[in-house]
Amino acid sequence: QNFFFILSFLSLIFSFWVTFKILDIRVKKLSFLIYILLALVSFPTRFTFGMGQNNFIVLPLILLSYYFFQNDKKELSGMFLGLAISFKTIFAFFLLFYLLKREWKIFAYSLLTILLSVLLTGGLFGWSLYSFYLSEVIPPLLNLEGREIYYNQGIFGFISRIVLDIGLRRIFGFVLSTLVGLTTIILSLKKRNTIYQFSLFFISLLLIDSLSWQHHFVWLIFPFVFLSQTFLNRRERALLVLLTFSYLLVSWNFKVIPDVRFASFMVLSHVFIGTILLFILNIKLFFKKDI
């Protein structure tokens, strides 16, 4: 357990390092430490460490995939993407990012890496592991009952706290998820700096996933660093205030669920609201004429 904690902590630091390499920023040591501290005090980080989740171990893999894509090393990009998906299948969402860029080589290498990972895992640990995953893990993900639990902070969690009827949950959740997904796809097709689009994919993933647990929101490290550095460089004080508010909403946690009768669904969806705000701030950059 101690080894896993140390590995996760080192992966957290490495994630920031790769992020600054992607952004091509030589950050001062003090600024780097402040970012680390802000990550450590947030609840998603503490939740990840406490639950023994591999979120921080996987994050550098998806970041390295983009870093090598950025540096035209497509084979390595595809391999790291495949490794990330092998650890967290939900990161298959990023295959869409590269497909929209028509990066067929990255797509092919990622699929090859996934195939090799499946064969290696099945050969070493037996195929019953995949049978269990398909029969016991996947089916509950398609069931929308219990999605209103506080720790679920995606679109479906938010909708489930408002709508009791399972059928309506599915409809409203699908409509909102489609809206977020289409917005992300349309903006990713534009010939802009791909960093903006890559950042948007992180945010969209957490909104669309039907089970976005609070510990998953550590993956917002890249969008938060990217937007904060962009707003600082542009001296966008108002946007920095909104970004800070977004961070506070995402980082907060109620140890005791408050008994709030008025707009309780809003209070209990603070991470979702903070992520939506982050989504809007990221989109706002697409409409800046000088970017």
Regions found by a protein language model. Give the residues of each.
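Primarily membrane-embedded glycan-assembly and transfer machineries that use lipid-linked glycans
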Residues: 1-76, 101-217, 221
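Transmembrane alpha-helices and membrane-interface helical segments
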Residues: 14, 60-71, 98-101, 221-234, ...
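Alpha-helical transmembrane segments of multi-pass membrane proteins
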Residues: 43, 205-206, 225, 247-251
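Residue-level detector of transmembrane insertion/anchoring sites
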Residues: 45, 78, 93, 270-274
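A cytosolic-side transmembrane-helix exit/cap motif
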Residues: 55, 78-82, 128-135, 218-225, ...
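Transmembrane helices and adjacent periplasmic/lumenal helix-loop junctions
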Residues: 81-98, 209-216
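Aromatic-enriched
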Residues: 228-291
